[in-house]
Swiss-Prot record:
Molecular-function annotations in GO: structural constituent of ribosome
Gene for this chain: rpmI
UniProt name for this protein: Large ribosomal subunit protein bL35
Organism: Cutibacterium acnes (strain DSM 16379 / KPA171202)
Keyword Plastid: no
Biological process according to GO: translation
Amino acid sequence: MPKMKSHSGTKKRFKVTGSGKVTARKAGKRHLNEHKSSRVTRRLTGETVLSKGEAAKVKKLLAGHPGR
C-alpha cells in the first residue's frame, strides 16, 4: 500500500499545537473591510482554536504529514 498523502491546502492553512489543538487564522478580514469598524478588524486579527469536530476533520487531512 502506498504512503498516505496529506492535503497540501490544509497544511498551508492550519497548525497543530503541541497539545493537539488545531489553530487557524480568523475569517473575514481579506477584503470588503472599508465598511467594517477598526474594532471589528482588530478582533479578526490573529488565530483561533478550532472546535473538536472541525479539528478531527483537519487532522484526518493531515494524517500523512510528519509530526501531526
